[in-house]
Structures are given as C-alpha cells and as structure tokens.
Amino acid sequence: MSEYTILPLINAAFQPGEAKRTVAGFEDRDFQEIARAEYYYFTGQAEECNHIAERYLMSHNIKLKMSSCLLYVYSNLTLGREAASRKGLREIQECLEKETKNPSSAEDRAVSVFAGYMSSVLLHLSVDELPDVELYAVTLPPGIKLFSAYVIAHMAYLKGEYGRALGICEAALMFRDDVYPISMIYLYCMIAMCQMNLKNQQKAKDALMLAWNVAKE
C-alpha cells in the first residue's frame, strides 16, 4: 500500500473495522490528515471532513490537492453548501486542464483524470470533454484502481447498460489483490442496483448483504 496517493484511505488495504487504526498508521502527517477527512466523510461527519479538506485546497502536491477537492465537493453537498461545492469542482477542472496540457508525471495525470471522473460521474455531470478514464486507470494504485472500476460501472449504469456495469464490478472484485473495504462497499452496492434493474431480486439482496457485512464491521 502506498499512502502517498489520492484518497489514501480508499487506497488502503485493511480488514473491515480497522479504518481508524489504519488512519493512525499513516506516517506522513498531511496524507494522514486527508485519510482522517475520508474517515470523517464515510462515517457521516461531513463538517469535520470539510474543515480538514479546506486546508489542502491550494496544496502544491496534486494528490493532496485533488483529494481535498473531492472531499470538499462532497462534504459541502452533504452540508447543503452548493456554492462551496462548485468551488471544489472548479479547482478539479482547472487542475485537470493543467495536467492535460503539461503533465507533471503519468501518475499525476492519471490521478487528475480519476478526480475529474469521480467529481462528475457521481454527480451525473457530463464527462464528454474529459480524457478516457479507462486509458489511465491502469496507472492508478490498486485501491484507487478498484474504486475507478466503480466509477466506470456507474457510468455504464447511468446509460442503462446494467449488464456491462455488473460485469465491470464482478471482474474488479474477482481480480482485486487485497481487501479494500470502501471500494468493495461501493462495488457491492452497484451490483445490487444492477441486479434490481435486471429483475434479479435475490441476487440484489445478496449483494446488499455483502456490502452491509463489510460496512458494519
């Protein structure tokens, strides 16, 4: 596991129930703070998440910046602060444009593309002008690559391509190299949504229970 990446807690491999301990184990203080903000967001503490995220919006480290922008976008949406959320979206778009024109590294460009999709697809915004995320996903670290599979599946789901979305999720889970609880919860939930639309109610229920068992621990 590399802690020096975008959304380090999502990227972290750990057993369900060990999120707080995982955050405490990060050695770099800044990435630990971002991981703590992720923990706050995923445990329903949007205000606490927002306080941390805001401090890193202008970071010169693209991984810290994109992490903070994403957390800022979604925590502010949760808090009903639309204007602040739009500010985070603009920061992501501007950073992606810079990396597209003058990439600092292949990894940083991939991180920027991923952030662009994560901030757009999950809000049902257009991705027509973004680079193809599937071309960059291979450069992402394992835990983020798994979450990118969820984002790609979500795109297919929004197009009504339920079978394709289901296949993406199942393949991602099959070939994962470790336990990544956050990504796995999202993937199982997407599987449940696809199975519901495919009229497979029992399979949808089974997928939801898998997500629940990961989350409740």
Show which residues each predicted segment covers.
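Amphipathic alpha-helical segments of tetratricopeptide repeats
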Residues: 17-24, 50-60, 90-103, 130-141, ...
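Domain-scale selection of a single, long terminal region
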Residues: 172-173, 192, 204
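Residue signature of alpha-solenoid helical repeat architecture, marking inter-repeat boundaries
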Residues: 27, 63, 106-107, 143, ...
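A compositional/structural signature marking long, glycine- and acidic/polar-rich segments
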Residues: 140-145, 150, 156-186
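Tandem amphipathic alpha-helical repeat scaffolds
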Residues: 2-15, 30-45, 66-82, 107-125, ...
